[in-house]
Swiss-Prot record:
Modes of activity regulation: Allosterically activated by ADP and other diphosphonucleosides, and allosterically inhibited by phosphoenolpyruvate.
Protein name, as recorded: ATP-dependent 6-phosphofructokinase isozyme 1
Alphabetically ordered keywords of this record: Allosteric enzyme, ATP-binding, Cytoplasm, Glycolysis, Kinase, Magnesium, Metal-binding, Nucleotide-binding, Transferase
Originating gene: pfkA
Reactions mediated catalytically: beta-D-fructose 6-phosphate + ATP = beta-D-fructose 1,6-bisphosphate + ADP + H(+)
Organism ancestry: Bacteria, Pseudomonadati, Pseudomonadota, Gammaproteobacteria, Enterobacterales
Cited PANTHER family: ATP-DEPENDENT 6-PHOSPHOFRUCTOKINASE (PTHR13697:SF4), PHOSPHOFRUCTOKINASE (PTHR13697)
Principal location: cytoplasm
Subunit structure: Homotetramer.
EC numbers, comma separated: 2.7.1.11
Residues annotated for Mg(2+) binding in this entry: 104
Superkingdom per UniProt: Bacteria
Length: 320
């Protein structure tokens, strides 16, 4: 029977993580459980850095970006001996189950702990929206708002100078954030990792737009696809139009979470406690068609496929 749980945030931070922690803590306390917060993700778990959390520990947290528990990347957690120390620390504290908030690397750690017999529930916290088994991740919509605001500002100056702007958006190997920002920001062109990319084809599309009378343009591109400064130079050379690159960077991870992320994080945090009390372990939470769902965390990591939002790309192209 579960009497005490632990909660940690791991990997890259995302707006709404604090709201998720709050959802976990207050739901657990309502059910009569104790909650331990673990500092700095799996690193803090290994180093046994924990704190008892009460309902006041998460007061005024729902609107705060980042994660007050902190986060850290800890690749050493792949080592089974390191994980064994972590489990010993959990048991020493009387913790019966663990809620992990983070991305796919965080899920991998939760999966390994599950395989070693310690029950974990994973919540998807990443701006990249690249987690299997869920339509959206905690932090995605806040990051989208940040990116669109930046695109709006760039459009102001691009139109003033009849300039082409290349905007690099986060997402790692998932184009969801770029696609959504391209639609919401009215970008003329979008480049994502799921679709083969050619600089020459992009330039030809830009030239076609210029021939139709377009005076300025925004190109949204997902990070890691190319050097955006070199791409901007190539576009300027081939089109004769002044072109500048903007890397939005880590500003996309910060800021107060938008209402949808606060709601999603709160619902998922509460649902994690429901699952643990129902006897579930080794699960990850998602939202599909606005309904909370849960999947086997091992199956989600190893077997499930994440569909590419091709309809978003089609929409973006129709609106060029």
């Amino acid at each position: 029977m579960i009497k005490k749980i632990g909660v940690l945030t791991s990997g890259g931070d995302a707006p709404g993580m604090n709201a998720a922690i709050r959802g976990v803590v207050r739901s657990a306390l309502t059910e009569g459980l104790e909650v331990m917060g673990i500092y700095d993700g799996y690193l803090g778990l290994y180093e046994d850095r924990m704190v008892q959390l009460d309902r006041y520990s998460v007061s005024d947290m729902i609107n705060r970006g980042g994660t007050f528990l902190g986060s850290a990347r800890f690749p050493e957690f792949r080592d089974e001996n390191i994980r064994a120390v972590a489990i010993e620390n959990l048991k020493k504290r009387g913790i019966d189950a663990l809620v992990v908030i983070g991305g796919d690397g965080s899920y991998m750690g939760a999966m390994r702990l599950t395989e070693m017999g310690f029950p974990c529930i994973g919540l998807p916290g990443t701006i990249d929206n690249d987690i299997k088994g869920t339509d959206y991740t905690i932090g995605f919509f806040t990051a989208l708002s940040t990116v669109v605001e930046a695109i709006d500002r760039l459009r102001d100056t691009s139109s003033s100078h009849q300039r082409i702007s290349v905007v690099e958006v986060m997402g790692r190997y998932c184009g969801d954030l770029t696609l959504a920002a391209a639609i919401a920001g009215g970008c003329e062109f979008v480049v994502v990792p799921e679709v083969e990319f050619s600089r020459e084809d992009l330039v030809n599309e830009i030239k076609a737009g210029i021939a139709k009378g377009k005076k300025h343009a925004i190109v949204a591109i997902t990070e890691h696809m190319c050097d955006v400064d070199e791409l901007a130079h190539f576009i300027e050379k081939e089109t004769g139009r002044e072109t500048r690159a903007t890397v939005l960077g880590h500003i996309q991870r910060g800021g107060s979470p938008v209402p949808y992320d606060r709601i999603l994080a709160s619902r998922m945090g509460a649902y994690a406690i429901e699952l643990l009390l129902a006897g579930y372990g080794g699960r990850c939470v998602g939202i599909q068609n606005e309904q909370l769902v849960h999947h086997d965390i091992i199956d989600a990591i190893e077997n499930m496929k994440r569909p590419f939002k091709g309809d978003w790309l089609d929409c973006a192209k129709k609106l060029y």
